[in-house]
A protein has these predicted regions:
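DNA breakage-rejoining catalytic core of tyrosine-based enzymes
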Residues: 279-292
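Acyl-group handoff/entry surfaces in thioester-processing enzymes
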Residues: 3, 55-137, 144-240, 244, ...
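Aromatic/hydrophobic pocket-lining residues that form π-stacking "cages" and hydrophobic walls in ligand
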Residues: 295
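Phosphopantetheine-dependent thiolation modules in NRPS/PKS and related acyl-activating systems
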Residues: 1-48, 123-127, 131, 206, ...
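Glycine-rich loop motifs involved in handling phospho/adenylate chemistry
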Residues: 11-24, 57-62, 91, 192, ...
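Hydrophobic "lid/gating" helix adjacent to the active-site nucleophile
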Residues: 103-119, 265-267, 298-332
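Short, solvent-exposed positions on alpha-helices
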Residues: 12, 97, 199-203, 304-308, ...
Length: 332
């Protein structure tokens, strides 16, 4: 919908995409908005080219999402709720120096990965650190017996994922290389959510493959320079979402969330603690091919996504267990 707003200069609510999920229906929604003279809140969204960025010595604001995470970190320092761990298994001969060079280039390309969060006059600001060589610590577990090796690899991965970040000092991306055997490695990556998300992790993995191959061959980066950085977006967002524009969006969500219960009471076998311990657990299960096919078929018939079908099923279950029909569901 942001591309629609950028191309046509009109605001089309996101719900229109789900009410009419075809190109023809979306085109009619755009035509209706144009005929009604419904401009975007600030006209078409401008791209934020590098030339519009504040000088490096100017305080860069946080995006609203970043500020929320910064506030939560200040409220409960040392929590690891927003650590994003990722374990990559690498098969075949590995050049650790080339891998470190690839990481260095990724950090150079993506300023968010070398950003820390300072406080100036009581307000958080982004500070982009200079690019430099990337040090890739490594641990060689290949001398351990197979069972002990796997246990130690799991222990190191869990310990790395549970290690807190210092948002004011960084780095907010950590990488550790484990050598399990000749031609077998694990790469432990841990991000803080303030500089990354699930989508960004996929981008990093794809770019790492391209940059590692280039480093092995002694070639420069094959990837084009990025036209914008996350700080560009944060600066644009802060300039746009202010005054009446911010008031309108805030009023909308206050109305949508008005009366929403603060928590969902479930028939648990023990009482809820006064202070959240965050000592939760996860239950993993798999859907067989038939179930996946049925899920995707239902989503197609309803003009929605498999995620929304699963979210609806989860809410239906929570409604049955809690006896409530007004529920909230948080997702990453």
């Amino acid at each position: 919908m942001s591309r629609v707003r950028e191309a046509f200069g009109v605001e089309v609510p996101l719900r229109r995409l789900f009410e009419g999920p075809t190109v023809a229906e979306l085109a009619r929604a755009v035509e209706t908005a144009l005929a009604a003279g419904a401009p975007a809140p600030d006209g078409p969204i401008p791209r934020a080219p590098r030339t519009l960025r504040a000088p490096a010595d100017t305080a860069l604001p946080l995006s609203f999402a970043q500020e929320r995470l910064w506030f939560l970190d200040r409220l409960e320092p040392g929590q690891t709720l927003y650590n994003l761990p990722l374990v990559l298994r690498l098969e075949g001969e590995l050049d650790a120096a080339a891998l470190a060079a690839a990481f260095g280039e990724i950090a150079r390309r993506h300023e968010a990965l070398r950003t820390v969060f300072a406080e100036r006059d009581g307000e958080p600001v982004q500070v982009v650190l200079p690019a430099g060589p990337w040090e890739l610590p490594a641990a060689d577990l290949s001398g351990l017996p197979a069972a002990a090796r796997e246990r130690e690899a799991d222990r190191l991965a869990a310990a790395e994922a549970a290690r807190p970040f210092d948002l004011s000092r960084g780095p907010l991306l950590r990488a550790v290389l484990l050598r399990l055997a000749p031609g077998r490695h694990e790469l432990l990556l841990t991000f803080h959510h303030i500089v990354s998300d699930g989508w960004s992790m996929g981008v990093l993995v794809r770019e790492m493959g391209a940059l590692y191959a280039a480093a092995l061959d002694g070639r420069p980066s094959p990837l084009p320079e990025l036209p914008v950085q996350y700080a560009d977006f944060a600066l644009w967002q802060r300039r746009w979402l202010t005054g009446k524009v911010l008031e309108r969006h805030t009023a909308y969500w206050r109305e949508r969330l008005r009366g929403l219960p603060a928590e969902t009471e479930l028939p648990a076998d023990r009482s809820r603690p006064a202070v959240a311990s965050h000592r939760g657990a996860e239950h993993r299960f798999a859907l067989d091919a038939g179930q996946v096919s049925a899920l995707e078929g239902l989503a197609r018939r309803e003009g929605t996504t498999p995620f929304m079908v699963l979210a609806a099923a989860t809410l239906a279950l929570l409604s049955r267990l809690s006896g409530r029909d007004d529920l909230s569901l948080g997702t990453p």
